[in-house]
Structure formats: structure tokens, C-alpha cells
């Protein structure tokens, strides 16, 4: 049977559930699809369908992730849920599932636990911009004061990691009761309150085409009589014929002008996010551009060599290293289309990093890369992926 046509009428937002093991992330995911489907249509998913998450690969790393979708009055949501803690770490660091906002699930009976804290920290490090809290298992707590105490703890924890704890929406409910169709305040109505919080608290994300122009350079050709053509896939924004643009990274930044855009051998007047194009550059020599640089709107992105990052190191069973690495480790960092060697500095007090760990590090690259916070990269040794990371903060 054919799947229903995807109606692109409502704005699209990516979200996901995060939080400690057994606090009810998957049950809540099932409850959201079940309750919202009754009102807005779509497909309900039960717990077992979500819990049996298929494997996918991102940046050479295998991750188990479940994807569900649902609609509210005003939006279409794609929602990710992961079965295990390690899958969350990998998912957030590789950006396999970019989240415009996260639903932090906290059991009202237990309060914040170690993974609650770790997921909030990860969300901060990898640039998840908004968190909404679902205080789950409210049916197991009779004491209103206890509920308030847990809520205060969660708000303090969010504030500690630079989220606006005092202004964060916290919805109290029971995913289990909602799933069973319970009509009390903590049953189905709690799911509708959560949906309303998603709709109002998470702003509609900027579409890629509305961003500032950026295109990673994949290949460079010289066409006699016409000049230099750079090919690649436009990551965001639009480039028009006649635009002044910059070539950034690896070498000193140079300005040039786009004198032509072609796609599938046809000349266009512009290329936009998602297009695989060739961009003709006026007066630029073939040897002035190379793979690993980017074409970008003038002044929009700068080259950097030093940054802090959150990384996940592949386990031995994932094809990663078999041994730990230490301070001064020098692998290659693969940004967009090229490898650059860099030296790793471990945080004070961390002796070594084992395969399977995630850790915050500082990196010094031997050549500058066009970089902004939130940029993803792979860590490689001789072409083999041994880890993944995301730029947390640029130092210089």
C-alpha cells in the first residue's frame, strides 16, 4: 500500500526525546503519536514499534534511532527517540538527527538522574537551542510539594547549563495514562499541553535556503577561455550570478565574483541550498581554490584553527580504536570535504580517553577551516573513522 502523500503545507520542525533511562521517553513518544493522531490524523505508533529502533549510519557510526512524525494545529513534527544512552550521545554529536528543540523527560518519582544532567550538557554542547520538560509518572506522586521540589531541581539544572530554567515550560503528566486514553488532567490533556508548548516555545527554524550562502568546495576545474569552476552542493542560502563571494579556509581568504552557475550542464541565474552546482569564478586561478575550502557570502564565516569540541570515540566493536589515546593525540579532523591534522588537548584531570567514551576536548589544527559553532566533523586515522565531534566553542 502506498504511503500517504507528504503535504508540505505546515512548517516542519525537528524534535526528539532526551532524558534518563526508564524515565519514560519511549512511552511518551508513543503517547504523543497516539493522542495527536486522534485529533489531527497521521499514524499512531505503539511502544514496541518505537522501541525496536532500526540501525542507521552517520559519519561512519552506527546508531539506533526511531523516527516518528505527528501533526499539531499549526505544524508538522519529525521526532527522534533512541533506545540506549550511547545512541543519544552518538546521535547528538554526529547531528544525525538535528533537533530544533528537545523534550526532556524526567520521572517525577525519581527527579533528575545522571543521564538527565548528561543529556542537558550534551544539548548545550551540540547546540540544541530549546528544551521543554515533560515531568512524567505524575500518577506515582501523591505529594504536590514533592512534585514542586522536582520541578525546582530540573529548573536549577537547566539554568546551570545556560538554558533559561525559570522560563522553560514544564508539563506534568503521565505518558502511560495518556497512552491508555485517560481523560484526567495528567492523561491525554497533558499531551495536548505538551503539543501547545512545542508549537509556541520552539520557534519555526530558518529554512536552509534562507540562510547566508555557503558551499563546501568538492572539486575545481579550469575551463579555458571561461575561468575556474568550483563544484559542490550548496549547503545553505542562494548564490546569484554577479554576487561577490569569498573563498574561505586553508589559505588566506580571497574575494571573487560568481560569473555563472550551472547544474546538469545547464546555465542558471542562481544556485540554492540543496543544489549540486558548478560555480564559475571571475579572475580566480585554478590553484587558488582547493577541496576543503568553502565559497561563502562575504564576511559571513571566518577561518579558525583552535576550538573546543564534544566528541564521541568509536568503540572497538564499531570499528574504532582498540586502545585509548592520550594528551597530544594527533589524528585528522574531517570537516565537510577534507582532512586536517590537529592536536588534541584533554581536559584537566583526564588521563586518557577510552574507545566508547564521549569527552570535551580542545583542538589545534595545522591549517584553518571555515568554522562556526555547531559544525560537525569526523575524527580519522589514515582514512578510517575513529570518532565524531561537534564544535562547541571557537577559541581563535
Curated annotation (Swiss-Prot):
EC number, as in UniProt: 3.6.5.3
Superkingdom per UniProt: Bacteria
First-listed, main subcellular location of the protein, grouped into a coarse class: cytoplasm
Entry binding sites for GTP: 19-26, 81-85, 136-139
GO molecular function: GTP binding; GTPase activity; guanosine tetraphosphate binding; translation elongation factor activity
Segments of this protein annotated with the region G4: 136-139
Record flagged with keyword Metal-binding: yes
Annotated spans, G5: 174-176
Catalytic reactions on record: GTP + H2O = GDP + phosphate + H(+)
Keywords: Cytoplasm, Elongation factor, GTP-binding, Hydrolase, Magnesium, Metal-binding, Nucleotide-binding, Protein biosynthesis
Binding site for Mg(2+): 26
SUBUNIT field: Monomer.
Stated name of the protein: Elongation factor Tu 2
Organism: Methylobacillus flagellatus (strain ATCC 51484 / DSM 6875 / VKM B-1610 / KT)
Gene: tuf2
